């Protein structure tokens, strides 16, 4: 296969979500090829220099390089559109055919709350390049768990939660929807206006789940996923509830949580629907710059999302409705 960057025009999916308060853009994309040689990507990213690395997660074995290209011609351009180029190796674990399957999956998804997939570039027996839009504010993880002076205001946190919920509601609305097994804070990207965009690559395989457990990344593991290996839309809802919880608490310091007690168990045993309890749990960096009523309502929503009984968890559209209501609470 020769050097090429391929991108796609858009058409509406067969099933669209219910109307949202923040209007989404729905479309699935049919592929029309346009070439960009690999040397163009190298030029755009300064030959994949280390100082161009913008995102690197050891859990998902991928690395992104920042570059700039002309939005129309896809040629390297200093004044062009920011891109994030991911270099994927074709080896015994993932072949060229595997990555092409990923490309086909990405080509069917387009939404304002999904990171825009611009195309791919590959050669036989060479690395496989996936090209995405560049997220100028980085990942949500870097803001919530970063430096104290970078703490996000309450209104921005709610806005990010709504955007993330919109992306998930869109995915859940599609027939035979792919479930977002990579839904984590570090895969929620933010643009310059703090609009949330889900980075979706492919459903997480069981081997990745096992590897995550070995590395201690069990914070988001739902009861049915961990014990029975059951994965469905309610699993996504549970994971989203965990993200809401970390948005609310804002700290990875688990010293106050007993080692044998999970984050959800700590939450459910500590949370009561009153303002005083919320003040003990909420991110202290917020000070008093938040609505205690809104935070309490978010706590109630978290409880619903993380219910052990999957039948008691709300649909993502219901979660979105709840968040839109929370956004309107000012007292």
Swiss-Prot record:
The entry's keywords: Cell membrane, Lipoprotein, Membrane, Myristate, Nucleus, Palmitate
Effect of deleting the gene: No visible phenotype. Slight hydration defects of wild-type pollen placed on the stigma of plants lacking both BKN1 and BKN2, but normal pollen grain adhesion and pollen tube growth.
Lipid attachment site numbers (N-myristoyl glycine): 2
Lipid attachment site numbers (S-palmitoyl cysteine): 4
Biological process annotations from GO: pollen-stigma interaction
Tissues where the protein occurs: Restricted to stigma in flowers.
Topology relative to the membrane: Lipid-anchor
Pfam family, one: PK_Tyr_Ser-Thr
Coiled coil location: none
UniProt keyword Methyltransferase, yes or no: no
Protein purpose: Collaboratively with BKN2/SZE2, involved in compatible pollen-stigma interactions.
Domain observations: The protein kinase domain is predicted to be catalytically inactive.
Official protein name in the record: Inactive serine/threonine-protein kinase BKN1
Organism: Arabidopsis thaliana
Gene that specifies this protein: BKN1
